[in-house]
Amino acid sequence: MDNILDLIPQRAPIVMIDEFLGFKGEISRSRLVVREDNIFVDDNTLSECGLIEHIAQSAAARVGYIFKSKDMPIPLGFIGSVNNFAISRHPAVGDDIITEIEIIQEVLSITLIEARCFINDEEIASCRMKIFLQQ
């Protein structure tokens, strides 16, 4: 796919997505390999804040991909709320996280998503997130 920095506004050291894997319908997928130098890593594990930021950037990459494909400027997005965040285990350095973002509802500039993070097909985290796009 495209260079991830072409799809999201974040820059190092806060980039929390390595690759946008594409989308079909309302579901998109992204990838992050947890590295030791990640600012959200402590004691060789990725924090809850890191997972939430990864989820938000995964949703942003979908928006970026759609807007870029239409040759339109990519809007900034902001987390409005995070609900029902659940984590069964913290990703460790070296883990390869695949995240699925499903669009639940889009109304004007507000999008409600459901996110699920996997390591080797094991679901390790999930949440719902409300995102506001700046128009």
Map each language-model feature to its residues.
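A conserved, well-ordered hydrophobic junction motif at loop->secondary-structure transitions
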Residues: 33-67
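Small-residue-enriched segments and motifs
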Residues: 15-18, 80, 99-101, 127
